[in-house]
Protein backbone atom coordinates (compact mmCIF):
# COMPACT_ATOMS: atom_id res chain seq x y z
CA UNK A 1 0.00 0.00 0.00
CA UNK A 2 1.30 3.46 -0.92
CA UNK A 3 0.99 6.09 1.83
CA UNK A 4 1.48 9.84 1.45
CA UNK A 5 2.82 11.47 4.60
CA UNK A 6 1.21 14.87 5.35
CA UNK A 7 2.23 17.23 8.11
CA UNK A 8 3.78 20.55 9.08
CA UNK A 9 6.98 21.57 7.28
CA UNK A 10 7.15 25.37 7.09
CA UNK A 11 8.47 26.82 10.33
CA UNK A 12 9.39 23.44 11.84
CA UNK A 13 13.17 23.31 12.31
CA UNK A 14 13.45 19.52 12.54
CA UNK A 15 10.73 18.63 10.01
CA UNK A 16 13.07 16.45 7.93
CA UNK A 17 13.92 14.32 10.96
CA UNK A 18 10.26 14.04 12.00
CA UNK A 19 9.16 13.02 8.51
CA UNK A 20 12.08 10.60 8.17
CA UNK A 21 11.21 8.88 11.46
CA UNK A 22 7.55 8.57 10.44
CA UNK A 23 8.59 7.25 7.02
CA UNK A 24 10.87 4.68 8.61
CA UNK A 25 8.16 3.44 10.97
CA UNK A 26 5.68 3.10 8.11
CA UNK A 27 8.25 1.39 5.91
CA UNK A 28 8.99 -1.08 8.71
CA UNK A 29 5.27 -1.94 8.70
CA UNK A 30 5.46 -2.73 4.98
CA UNK A 31 4.10 0.49 3.48
CA UNK A 32 5.60 2.33 0.53
CA UNK A 33 5.89 5.96 1.66
CA UNK A 34 5.70 9.16 -0.37
CA UNK A 35 7.49 11.73 1.77
CA UNK A 36 7.26 15.42 0.75
CA UNK A 37 10.09 16.34 3.15
CA UNK A 38 12.59 14.94 0.65
CA UNK A 39 11.84 17.76 -1.80
CA UNK A 40 14.65 20.30 -2.24
CA UNK A 41 14.47 23.73 -0.63
CA UNK A 42 14.07 26.92 -2.64
CA UNK A 43 10.90 26.34 -4.65
CA UNK A 44 7.67 28.34 -4.45
CA UNK A 45 4.75 27.20 -2.30
CA UNK A 46 2.75 26.70 -5.50
CA UNK A 47 5.44 24.42 -6.94
CA UNK A 48 5.55 22.35 -3.75
CA UNK A 49 1.77 22.05 -3.69
CA UNK A 50 1.62 20.86 -7.32
CA UNK A 51 4.18 18.15 -6.56
CA UNK A 52 2.44 17.16 -3.33
CA UNK A 53 -0.95 16.89 -5.04
CA UNK A 54 0.61 14.56 -7.63
CA UNK A 55 2.05 12.50 -4.77
CA UNK A 56 -1.36 12.38 -3.08
CA UNK A 57 -2.95 11.22 -6.33
CA UNK A 58 -0.35 8.44 -6.54
CA UNK A 59 -1.03 7.23 -2.99
CA UNK A 60 -3.63 4.74 -1.81
CA UNK A 61 -4.11 6.65 1.44
CA UNK A 62 -2.92 9.87 3.10
CA UNK A 63 -1.74 9.79 6.69
CA UNK A 64 -1.55 12.96 8.77
CA UNK A 65 1.24 13.57 11.28
CA UNK A 66 0.61 15.24 14.65
CA UNK A 67 0.22 19.01 14.32
CA UNK A 68 -1.05 18.89 10.73
CA UNK A 69 -3.92 21.21 11.70
CA UNK A 70 -1.37 23.98 12.31
CA UNK A 71 0.02 23.76 8.77
CA UNK A 72 -1.59 25.72 5.95
CA UNK A 73 -0.24 23.25 3.40
CA UNK A 74 -1.45 20.18 5.30
CA UNK A 75 -4.89 21.77 5.74
CA UNK A 76 -5.06 22.29 1.97
CA UNK A 77 -4.10 18.63 1.52
CA UNK A 78 -6.79 17.57 4.01
CA UNK A 79 -9.41 19.66 2.21
CA UNK A 80 -8.33 18.18 -1.13
CA UNK A 81 -8.64 14.66 0.29
CA UNK A 82 -12.03 15.46 1.80
CA UNK A 83 -13.47 16.88 -1.41
CA UNK A 84 -12.04 14.15 -3.63
CA UNK A 85 -12.96 11.28 -1.31
CA UNK A 86 -9.40 10.09 -0.64
CA UNK A 87 -8.84 7.83 2.37
CA UNK A 88 -7.10 9.64 5.22
CA UNK A 89 -5.79 8.43 8.56
CA UNK A 90 -4.02 9.86 11.59
CA UNK A 91 -0.42 8.63 11.67
CA UNK A 92 -0.69 7.46 15.28
CA UNK A 93 -3.51 5.08 14.37
CA UNK A 94 -1.79 3.73 11.28
CA UNK A 95 1.21 2.85 13.44
CA UNK A 96 -1.07 0.91 15.80
CA UNK A 97 -2.21 -1.56 13.17
CA UNK A 98 -3.93 -2.27 9.88
CA UNK A 99 -4.92 0.96 8.17
CA UNK A 100 -8.13 -0.63 6.88
CA UNK A 101 -9.30 -1.21 10.48
CA UNK A 102 -8.63 2.36 11.55
CA UNK A 103 -11.77 4.37 12.26
CA UNK A 104 -10.57 7.87 13.21
CA UNK A 105 -9.49 9.76 10.10
CA UNK A 106 -8.51 13.25 9.07
CA UNK A 107 -11.77 13.37 7.13
CA UNK A 108 -13.67 12.78 10.37
CA UNK A 109 -11.95 15.81 11.87
CA UNK A 110 -12.58 17.84 8.71
CA UNK A 111 -16.31 16.99 8.78
CA UNK A 112 -16.56 18.08 12.41
CA UNK A 113 -15.03 21.46 11.62
CA UNK A 114 -17.25 22.09 8.64
Regions found by a protein language model. Give the residues of each.
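Conserved catalytic or regulatory cores that recognize and/or transform ribose-phosphate-containing ligands
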Residues: 1-114
